[in-house]
Design a protein with these regions (language model features):
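Short, low-complexity N-terminal intrinsically disordered segments enriched in polar/charged residues
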Residues: 1-35, 144-148
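A beta-strand edge to alpha-helix "cap/lid" segment located at domain peripheries
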Residues: 2-9, 70-148
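Hydrophobic alpha-helical core bundles mediating ligand binding, dimerization, or RNAP-core interactions
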Residues: 14, 18-21, 33, 65, ...
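Short, flexible active-site loop motifs that bind/organize anionic cofactors or intermediates
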Residues: 16-19, 55, 75, 126
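Short, mixed-charge, low-aromatic patches
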Residues: 20-29, 51-54, 71-73, 95
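A solvent-exposed, acidic/Ser-Thr-rich amphipathic alpha-helical stretch
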Residues: 35-89
Length: 148
């Protein structure tokens, strides 16, 4: 008899994904993705996507998502902390605090929500950032959005 995945299983998977991110183990993260994973895909492009923010561009499939991690690899991580992980059915939300310095001199610090959606087999089928995209756009343009 097959067992179905639970919200707890999916939340544990996301905790493992963030642990892999902390180790720089991109392969372990990509292993958790469905072949057709929709990464930052929305019904309409977001303002950040229209502005060309490289880490918020829409991507499809693990090979394309690897490009997201290549972009992050060019950034300096100043702070990254998972504050909470909350699950409901096929979806898990992670509350994170993130601060990065970008190659062009821009910086951003933000508290974000990351929405992860799963299939029945426990693979991630969709990922979306919910963040202050104005900060991300400004940082991509070389601005330091951490200065008040």
């Amino acid at each position: 008899m097959a067992t179905s995945r639970t919200t707890t299983d999916n939340a544990a998977t996301i905790a493992d994904v963030y642990a892999a991110f902390g180790r720089g183990d991109v392969a372990a993260i990509l292993d958790r993705l469905a072949p057709d994973v929709a990464w930052e895909e929305w019904d309409e492009p977001t303002f950040a996507q229209l502005a060309g923010v490289p880490h918020l561009l829409a991507r499809t499939g693990p090979a394309d998502v690897a490009g997201f991690f290549a972009v992050l690899g060019s950034y300096t991580v100043l702070d990254f902390a998972v504050l909470d992980i909350i699950g409901s059915g096929r979806q898990v939300v992670a509350e994170v605090r993130a601060s990065f310095a970008l190659p062009g001199g821009g910086r951003f610090a933000d508290e974000e929500l990351h929405l992860w959606t799963f299939d029945d087999g426990g693979r991630v089928t969709r990922f979306r950032h919910y963040s202050d995209t104005a900060k991300h756009i400004a940082a991509t343009r070389g601005e330091d959005t951490t200065v008040r």
